[in-house]
Amino acid sequence: NLPALVSGSHADSVPQGGNYDGLAGIVAALTVARWMRETGYQPERDYTVLMMRMEESSWFGKCYVGSLGMTGQLTEKDLALKHRSNGKTLAETIKECGFNPDDLTTGKPVVDLSKMAAFIELHIEQGPTLDSSDEYRVGIVTGIRGNLRHKTIRCIGQTAHSGAVDKQFRHDAVLAFAE
């Protein structure tokens, strides 16, 4: 028995993440499974569809919660994180979904990772690169930037006309912060 080829994505999204943020990958993975069944195609290894939740950091300030939980790597500190709009903890939210949050902090994977050969995720582009290209319609991503937000930082300064007031006399808060 060879380890399975796993495909899927996350069901959550970020604000303005696009209509099909992670869902495109779930639908694509299910479409492949349906095609295999309908055509009778039998791959050399099992094909598994995987859907995760809470991969985005927009609600609890931590990304990959679903993956970390699936691999038993969540911590008590993670479970105490509060939802940005309703104030419920991650542990409360997991319980409301019908799961025991304590099962996700044991250090033991919920799934047997040795039975997975690879994970393939089809994902929409959330930027303009492919959309503006006449040549490329598909891209392969080799890395992405991290996600870090500072919601409580304030830049305080004075406004001044950039054409009339020399830079040395301005107190531009954003410029000072950037420098």
Predicted regions, residues:
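General beta-strand structural signal in soluble alpha/beta enzymes
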Residues: S7-S9, V49-M51, C155
